[in-house]
């Protein structure tokens, strides 16, 4: 089953969670986004990276929720590290209540090597992000300008975020899960 929604100038076919025909299964996403020996920790880290990217681009305020035009890959890397470390500092019972095991995701992130040469191997931090960004680009959600290490969102993602995901209830929920203070 799925929903048909119209946002802005586009029509979206949105699969429900138990849909087996549209979208991606957890295993398909794990295979596309993570290294071949990936565990659930790696998969959840990939989802955390995507959520972090969305929160950095969209703030849920005003007529358009978009807060910025572009982001550098290095800045995204720093945001991921900061958010994971902040999440680990919070109480364990808070982690369990929110359903995010920050320590497990931080462990998976720290297990990835750093490579200043721009390795695209999924076993490096840079390669891990590279594969996630390429996946999002193939889905038409971002433009990834590799030469400049720049990430830009597409009109498709902007419309979807404005009309569906970033109503205030959803936005506050995402911020709470990520541990972001917002007024």
Place the predicted regions along the sequence by residue:
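Positively charged, polyanion-binding regions of nucleic-acid-associated proteins
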Residues: 44-79
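A short, conserved structural fragment
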Residues: 1-7, 133-148
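A contiguous, surface-oriented mixed alpha/beta subdomain in the mid-to-C-terminal portion of proteins
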Residues: 90-94, 142-144, 172-177
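Short, cationic-aromatic polyanion-contact patches
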Residues: 14-20, 147-171
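Short acidic, hydrophobic short linear motifs in intrinsically disordered regions
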Residues: 66-80, 89-93, 98-120
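Eukaryotic partner-binding/assembly regions in large regulatory complexes
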Residues: 1-53, 57
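Short amphipathic alpha-helical interaction segments
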Residues: 122-138
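Short, amphipathic alpha-helical interaction segments positioned at domain boundaries
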Residues: 28, 113-117, 138, 157-183
